[in-house]
Amino acid sequence: FALAHMVNDFDIMKSYLDEGANGIETDITFSPEGEPESAFHGVPCDCKRWCDRTVSFDSYLQKTSDLSTPGHPDYRENLLIIILDLKLNGLSQDALANGGRRLADKLAAHFWTVGRRDQRATFVVSVPQTSQKVFMKTFREGMEAIGMGDMNAKVGFDFTDNGDVSVTKAVYDELGITEHIWASDGITNCVALLFRGTSRLEELIQKRDEGESTYISKVYAWTYDKETSVVLALELGVDGVMTNYADFVISILNKPEHSSKYRLATYEDDPFERFKAV
């Protein structure tokens, strides 16, 4: 997956989809009460990016629903996965709980109501810290409560705190989440990968490959903008690369030395199916 980073308005969304990105990551802000409000990152953000792009969350959902619905004039077949990078830090536990329910309500309203279930996008609900696990809990409960439990097939989960892998697994076990788990490791593009290292990324890939007992479906790295970093990630066996330059990542993927082992995912590929590194 070539995952376009910080896709927070429609102009940049079009640009990345034109480049061939098959996934987008969007920052979602919340009110103090836990109501999803807008796609917005703000400063600071990645180097060489405009931090203040924004649209309302409802407008964002309507647009991405149109883009992922076959037969709609705006349909884009390469939009496969939408990572919702949820800006939850600072919210109380009550607000987190409300936020999970409200996100379920909004996704259902825009994507899975009667007559709209043919849309093709899959979501990753990306929570910053394991201490905010109640958000995932109430999201899943909310989906069941509104009769959308079957649509959990289109939803995955991710914690982005670069935390201890065993602790993260214990939290998923507590939540009863045993599949559809995307695991990520990364750092802003303003810091060289040399300083971050890849030891945790390699640990995630190893856990993914351990067998049927593992809890990880996919592993992605962020935010990789340099060829050396992208090549290293591919050689390690990641499932996705999040980047500010989707066309650049795709061009690397298409080089002969990589295209014999990897290709860009399509709709026929299950975003939650586990593939081992070779």
From Swiss-Prot:
Co-factor note (free text): Binds 1 Mg(2+) ion per subunit.
Tissue specificity note: Expressed by the venom gland.
Domain of life: Eukaryota
Signal peptide: none
Binding sites annotated in the UniProt record for Mg(2+): E25, D27, D85
Disulfide bridges in this chain: C45-C51, C47-C190
GO biological process, one term: lipid catabolic process
UniProt keyword annotation of Disulfide bond present: yes
Keywords for this protein: Cytolysis, Dermonecrotic toxin, Disulfide bond, Hemolysis, Lipid degradation, Lipid metabolism, Lyase, Magnesium, Metal-binding, Secreted, Toxin
EC number: 4.6.1.-
Active site: H5, H41 (nucleophile)
EC top class, as a word: lyase
Any one Gene Ontology cellular component term annotated for this protein: extracellular region
One annotated GO molecular function: phosphoric diester hydrolase activity
Cofactor(s) named in the record: Mg(2+)
Compartmental location: Secreted
SUPFAM superfamilies in the cross-refs: PLC-like phosphodiesterases
Catalytic activity: an N-(acyl)-sphingosylphosphocholine = an N-(acyl)-sphingosyl-1,3-cyclic phosphate + choline; an N-(acyl)-sphingosylphosphoethanolamine = an N-(acyl)-sphingosyl-1,3-cyclic phosphate + ethanolamine; a 1-acyl-sn-glycero-3-phosphocholine = a 1-acyl-sn-glycero-2,3-cyclic phosphate + choline; a 1-acyl-sn-glycero-3-phosphoethanolamine = a 1-acyl-sn-glycero-2,3-cyclic phosphate + ethanolamine
Family: Belongs to the arthropod phospholipase D family. Class II subfamily.
Functional note: Dermonecrotic toxins cleave the phosphodiester linkage between the phosphate and headgroup of certain phospholipids (sphingolipid and lysolipid substrates), forming an alcohol (often choline) and a cyclic phosphate. This toxin acts on sphingomyelin (SM). It may also act on ceramide phosphoethanolamine (CPE), lysophosphatidylcholine (LPC) and lysophosphatidylethanolamine (LPE), but not on lysophosphatidylserine (LPS), and lysophosphatidylglycerol (LPG). It acts by transphosphatidylation, releasing exclusively cyclic phosphate products as second products.
Protein name: Dermonecrotic toxin LspiSicTox-betaIE2iii
Organism lineage: Eukaryota, Metazoa, Ecdysozoa, Arthropoda, Chelicerata
